[in-house]
Each structure stands twice: as C-alpha cells, then as structure tokens.
C-alpha cells in the first residue's frame, strides 16, 4: 500500500557545467523517474493488460462478443418471464389489497368534535359536495 519506489538514475556531472545544463539534467531524471512510476502503476492495476486494445477490438466487432456462443437452452429458459414468477403467484399474499376498499368497521372513528352528532339530509348533501370538490371528484 505504500508509495512506489523512487528510482534515482545518476547522471554524469562535471564540475564546470552551467546552471542551465544542471536544470536540464534534473528535468531528465525527473521525467525518467515519473515514467518508471507510471509503468509500475500500470502493471499493478491491469497486470500489464492493455485495455485500450480490448476496447478497440470490441468496437471493431460491432459490440458483439464472440467469446460467448449463442446457447439455445439459455435463451429458451428466459423466453417466458411468467414461468419465473409462477410459483410466487400461487402463494397467498398476506399484505393489504389496495384494489378493494376496507370495510367501514375496520376504519377508525373520527373524534366526536370533528363531526356534528345529528345530520339533516341537506347537510349530508352539502358535505358530500364539499368533499367531492376538495378531492376533485366529478359530481
């Protein structure tokens, strides 16, 4: 997990070399060191495998993978998706069925102060109209 090793390649230097020449030599050694690190990292990640060549080959094949033959038994087993869920459809589902409304006896009763105790038929009609308007149900 540690960092890559640093390769220092000694460059022959003479004592009378100008500063520009020394800077060039330093740049060359840095470039060589960075190239060695890049090669080392590529080998670690891809184990020396060239991924761009594989991508180019896949593109040339038109996206078709030639490594896997067309297996008819595999395709026929997936041809009917209903067969995959057939065993599950026969089992009873214990959850709520949302297609059927719950019976009024199961529903909780509203607090007494929400609803007046006595209703006139006209009050019920007005309340029904108001509820349908609020819920945007066609009257």
Swiss-Prot record:
Effect the entry attributes to changing residue 104 to A: Abolishes the interaction with the nuclear receptors but not decapping enzyme
Tissue and organ expression note: Expressed in heart, lung, muscle and brain.
Cross-referenced InterPro entries: PNRC-like_rgn, PNRC1/2
Predominant localisation class: nucleus
Comp. bias intervals (Pro residues): 101-110
Compartments, as annotated in UniProt: Nucleus; Cytoplasm, P-body
Domain of life per record: Eukaryota
GO cellular component: cytosol; Golgi apparatus; nucleoplasm; nucleus; P-body
Disordered, as annotated region: 1-51, 61-80, 89-110
GO biological process: deadenylation-independent decapping of nuclear-transcribed mRNA; nuclear-transcribed mRNA catabolic process, nonsense-mediated decay
Biased composition (Polar residues): 11-36, 61-79
Keywords from the UniProt entry: Activator, Cytoplasm, Nonsense-mediated mRNA decay, Nucleus, Transcription, Transcription regulation
UniProt motif SH3-binding: location: 99-105
Signal peptide: none
Task of the protein: Involved in nonsense-mediated mRNA decay (NMD) by acting as a bridge between the mRNA decapping complex and the NMD machinery. May act by targeting the NMD machinery to the P-body and recruiting the decapping machinery to aberrant mRNAs. Required for UPF1/RENT1 localization to the P-body. Plays a role in glucocorticoid receptor-mediated mRNA degradation by interacting with the glucocorticoid receptor NR3C1 in a ligand-dependent manner when it is bound to the 5' UTR of target mRNAs and recruiting the RNA helicase UPF1 and the mRNA-decapping enzyme DCP1A, leading to RNA decay.
Similarity comment: family membership: Belongs to the PNRC family. PNRC2 subfamily.
Subunit structure: Interacts with UPF1/RENT1; preferentially interacts with hyperphosphorylated form. Interacts with DCP1A. Interacts with many nuclear receptors including ESR1, ESRRA, ESRRG, NR3C1/GR, NR5A1, PGR, TR, RAR and RXR.
Domain description: The interaction between PNRC2 and nuclear receptors is dependent on the SH3 binding motif.
Record protein name field: Proline-rich nuclear receptor coactivator 2
Taxonomic lineage of the native organism: Eukaryota, Metazoa, Chordata, Craniata, Vertebrata
């Amino acid at each position: 997990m540690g960092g890559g090793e640093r390769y220092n390649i000694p460059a022959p230097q003479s004592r009378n070399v100008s500063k520009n020449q020394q800077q060039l030599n330093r740049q060359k050694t840095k470039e060589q060191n960075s190239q060695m690190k890049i090669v080392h990292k590529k080998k670690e990640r891809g184990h020396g495998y060239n991924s761009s060549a594989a991508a180019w080959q896949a593109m040339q094949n038109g996206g078709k993978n030639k490594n896997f033959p067309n297996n008819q038994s595999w395709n026929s087993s997936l041809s009917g998706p209903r067969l995959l869920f057939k065993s599950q459809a026969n089992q009873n589902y214990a959850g709520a069925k949302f297609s059927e409304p719950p019976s009024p006896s199961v529903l909780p009763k509203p607090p007494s102060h929400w609803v007046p105790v006595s209703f006139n038929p006209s009050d019920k009609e007005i309340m029904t109209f108001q509820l349908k308007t609020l819920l945007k149900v066609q009257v």
